[in-house]
């Protein structure tokens, strides 16, 4: 894919910033100097940055409780994100949301949700209003592999196809739904096959390859807008941290835990 120098610099800067930020947050979590749970996205940076590099800056997105990377890639202010994690009034949500609930409507960040699969219905609403009002903004909702078992996801997917709205369901398949391996909770060979139930177009890609993520997302956006239809994207990757900071990860086989390192973005 052709990427100009400015975009390449933006991609590198965002990848580096997210990793540095999360490693620092991880250290802070060990020191127990912030309230509440912290969920880092170390290992998922390529998905955050790749998808956001394909979206316009004012497009709509929603995130999950593992939202720091999405927020940074969406150009939310680092100082405001950090203040929010500390519960300060200067935080992006005035300190009321904490780590799991980052939002900034001015940047197109409709919200990060501590409840699994709470984002798809919200982004569906954004996509529907764009269609009704003749808008051109794209709408994308980030979910994890565990979210596909939640009713809210299926309701949003069904209505998105019924109403033919252009939006993206971006699934970060990081091999574990909390402590449950994908092979133990998924009854299809490939996670993206879930979309067949809704006659939805789907793509699959390497979540550790930022350029592949970006290209697949660009192609999906073009197709989604041209056909006025939702599209399901599955990006396979691996989270190097636990489900939350403090998770001992005893449920993970050593082979799985160490093998992704050479593919680390």
Residue ranges and their predicted role:
Residues 23-27, 31-163, 181-187, 192, ...:
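Cofactor-binding active-site loop characterized by glycine-rich and histidine/acidic residues
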Residues 66, 172-175, 207-208, 236-238:
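Short, ordered loop/turn segments at secondary-structure junctions
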Residues 69-71, 148-149, 176-179, 211-212, ...:
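Flexible loop/turn segments at secondary-structure boundaries
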Residues 163, 175-225:
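Ligand/cofactor pocket segment of small-molecule handling proteins
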Residues 165-169:
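A glycine-rich helix N-cap at a beta->alpha junction
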Residues 211-248:
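Structural signature of the thiamine diphosphate
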Residues 257-265:
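Single conserved hydrophobic/aromatic residue that forms the stacking wall/gate
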């Amino acid at each position: 894919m052709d990427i100009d120098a400015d975009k390449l610099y933006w991609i590198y800067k965002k990848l580096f910033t997210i990793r540095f930020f999360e490693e620092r947050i991880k250290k802070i979590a060990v020191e127990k100097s912030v309230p509440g749970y912290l969920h880092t996205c170390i290992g998922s940076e390529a998905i955050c940055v790749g998808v956001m590099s394909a979206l316009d800056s004012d497009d709509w997105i929603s995130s999950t409780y593992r939202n720091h990377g999405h927020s940074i890639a969406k150009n939310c202010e680092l100082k405001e994100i950090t203040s929010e994690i500390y519960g300060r009034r200067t935080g992006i949500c005035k300190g009321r949301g904490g780590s799991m609930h980052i939002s900034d409507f001015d940047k197109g960040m409709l919200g990060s949700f501590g409840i699994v699969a709470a984002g798809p219905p919200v982004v569906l609403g954004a996509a529907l209003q764009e269609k009704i009002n003749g808008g051109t903004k794209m709408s994308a909702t980030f979910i994890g592999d565990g979210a596909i078992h939640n009713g809210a996801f299926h309701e949003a997917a069904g209505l998105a196809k019924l109403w033919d709205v252009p939006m993206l369901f971006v699934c970060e398949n990081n091999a574990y739904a909390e402590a449950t391996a994908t092979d133990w909770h998924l009854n299809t060979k490939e996670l993206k096959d879930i979309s067949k139930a809704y006659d939805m177009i789907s793509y699959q890609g390497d979540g550790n390859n930022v350029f592949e993520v970006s290209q697949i997302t660009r192609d999906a956006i073009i197709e989604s807008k041209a056909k006025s239809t939702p599209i399901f994207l599955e990006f396979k990757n691996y989270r190097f941290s636990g489900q939350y900071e403090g998770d001992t990860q005893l449920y993970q086989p050593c082979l799985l835990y160490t093998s992704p390192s050479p593919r680390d973005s």
